[in-house]
Curated annotation (Swiss-Prot):
GO terms for cellular component: mitochondrial outer membrane; peroxisomal membrane; peroxisome. It comes from Bos taurus (Bovine). The chain crosses the membrane at residues 123-143. This is Mitochondrial fission 1 protein. The C-terminus is required for mitochondrial or peroxisomal localization, while the N-terminus is necessary for mitochondrial or peroxisomal fission, localization and regulation of the interaction with DNM1L.
Amino acid sequence: MEAVLNELVSVEDLLKFERKFKSEKAAGSVSKSTQFEYAWCLVRSKYNDDIRKGLALLEELLPKGSKEEQRDYVFYLAVGNYRLKEYEKALKYVRGLLQTEPQNNQAKELERLIDKAMKKDGLVGMAIVGGMALGVAGLAGLIGLAVSKSKS
């Protein structure tokens, strides 16, 4: 599962599916499979803007898909949001998937990895906030010391 989360699309694949998508769009109608393939490539990009574009395409597909297609769309919506570190959204999608498919092992593993990332980032976030608080307290102490020395 971690390979799926960390896999990067090749430039060749991205360009190939982008051309196909734009060609169909110019002709007036993009097939669901073409839109999904392009979105899937974008979600695996190293650029956050591409990932967001891929997520928008997947969200657009969601109401149009069959139950099986929707499962794939929701899964990649979770993956894309994970890659953007939008863990709350990723969790929402993966838990929605688990409500309809409680035995889906891929979704269970993805949920576990999202929870793990949230805990890791939460601890890192708390350490940063704690460090900032210590810095502010230290600075206030130094200012207080300087003020008291200047008065004496």
